[in-house]
Design a protein with these regions (language model features):
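Extended repeat-based scaffolds of very large eukaryotic assembly and lipid-transport proteins
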Residues: 1-112
Length: 112
C-alpha cells in the first residue's frame, strides 16, 4: 500500500506507526491530534500487532520494534520500500513526551 508520507508500506509497518500514535488522515498516516484519536490509534495498532504476530509486548513500542527487527523478513517490518522512513518516525515518537505519557496511561488503564 502506498502512503503519501511514507511510500510503499507493509501492514506491520502501519501497525507499529499506529502504536506510536499515528492515525489515518485520508491517504496518509500522521501523528494523531488530540488525546482520544491518539489512544484509539494506539489501541488499534496494539491489537493489529498482537493478531499479526501472536506476540504481546503490550504498549511497549521499543520492545515491539526490537522484536520485529529481530524476526527479520518473517515479520516484514524491515521491508526496504518504506523501512527507513517508518523506522525513523517510530524512533522519533519514542522520544516524544506526549506519546510516552499516553502509552503509559494506556498500559496502566487497559490492564486494570
Amino acid at each position: 500500500m502506498t502512503i503519501r508520507n511514507f511510500g510503499r508500506v507493509v501492514p506491520i509497518q502501519i501497525f507499529l506507526l499506529q502504536l506510536v500514535g499515528y492515525e489515518w488522515k485520508g491517504r496518509s498516516l500522521d501523528p494523531a491530534t488530540g488525546g482520544n484519536a491518539r489512544k484509539r490509534a494506539m489501541r488499534d495498532g496494539l491489537r493489529s500487532l498482537q493478531k499479526s504476530t501472536g506476540a504481546d509486548f503490550g504498549y511497549n513500542p521499543a520492545a515491539w520494534r526490537e522484536h520485529l527487527i529481530s524476526t527479520g523478513e518473517e515479520a516484514g517490518y524491515k521491508h526496504p520500500y518504506a523501512f527507513a522512513r517508518v523506522d525513523q518516525a517510530v524512533c522519533k515518537s519514542l522520544e516524544d513526551p506526549t506519546v510516552i505519557a499516553t502509552l503509559k496511561e494506556l498500559s496502566e488503564s487497559d490492564t486494570a
